[in-house]
Amino acid sequence: MLNPGQTNTRKGEINLPASVNLTGCENLLWKIVNNNGVANFALPTSVNDIAPFIGASGDVIGANTSAEAPSMNENARILLDGTCNPGDKLALSSTNYGRVYAPASGAGSLLVEFIAEEAGVAGQTVLVRRIPARLVTF
């Protein structure tokens, strides 16, 4: 990076302690939470959470875990709740936190950060593309 003011920064995978048990939570969306002044990873707990990280290596509470934050110039895979088609807007699932789903008409206003790049079924790691976060009314 050419900007000398950008010291101690990095791109790509980051490692943080788990604030909850993240064992088996790979390919789910994670968020950063404050744990007594220390950044930790956790699963989202609300459909309006900002959870831009895809879990790469989960572990028990307090152990180091790793996650990636895909940029808008790359695609990624996230566990899907329900079904989707290419081009569907994807929001955080309210029943399986960390997964995404394609909300149906009438679902209300939800935060959307990804679109589907392929058709998918429940439990699949569906190919997605990150988009600028926005509230969408379904």
PLM regions and their residue ranges:
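Surface-exposed, low-hydrophobicity beta-strand/loop segments enriched in small/polar/acidic residues
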Residues: 1-138
